[in-house]
Amino acid sequence: LKFPKLMCSDIEYTLPKPNYTIETLNHLISCQANVSFSLLIGEDNLVNFNKWKEYKNILKLVDLYVYPRKHRNKIPNHLLKHSKINLLDAPKLDFASSDIRKKLKKGEVIKSSIPTSTMAYLEKNNIYK
């Protein structure tokens, strides 16, 4: 793998519903206390991050990495300045993971939207099927 420290998990499907990020993180940390976790979200999610359940506790548990989007959103100043929130310098994409999931569920082709290696991984591991 290109990123050996990244791991895909279906943990959110196995936890009771409704499930919130703070609950997923608490579960992961309790199961793997020796692992350092980070959270990666799209910039579009950072705009409303302060409305997430226990968002301050999320930031106590993990560093937050924010992937940029083509369309700049209005991010609250206190979040931009937070020491645990890291804005990534990466190619700006005009779609979100939710867009990819919707297309996959409809059986639409997404190969032009994501790297070939990512598509191969999704297919090999039956992710989103």
PLM regions and their residue ranges:
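Nucleotidyltransferase catalytic core that binds NTPs
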Residues: 1-129
